[in-house]
Amino acid sequence: MMGKREALHAILNGQRADRIPVIMNAFSLPVARYGYTMAQVMQQPDKMVECMVGTRRQLGYDGLCLGVYSGITRQIAGHLPNSEGKIVGDGDDVIHSFEDIKKLKEFHVKKCPWLEKMKYMIYRMREEEPDEPIYVIVHTPSS
């Protein structure tokens, strides 16, 4: 059987893998398991690392996961109306045509503080589990 990284590389290269790597994508489960709130782990990255690494170890996932879910979409698409015609500021449900894509604002890394925290968390996760793949999920504006 393929190892975690071998299977991932095969999948990313469009090749056949004999297994599908499984990761923890829902941050709320690890956070709840450790008794923290989302606000706490967002403000204290070491708590997020504790939750994600500990849950991976306990449940045997094939890697660690981090994500930037709202910062990017808010920044580049929060000004656009959703399918109900409302501007709610979250950037969700706003891309319905090529014209909508043209209305996206430029993304500025320095205006997204969560990215800096993510770099730190990747460093900490690598310290804790040097052999585990780390998957970074970036949420983009959606239809």
For the regions a protein language model found, what residue spans apply to each?
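Catalytic cores of TIM-barrel enzymes
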Residues: 1-143
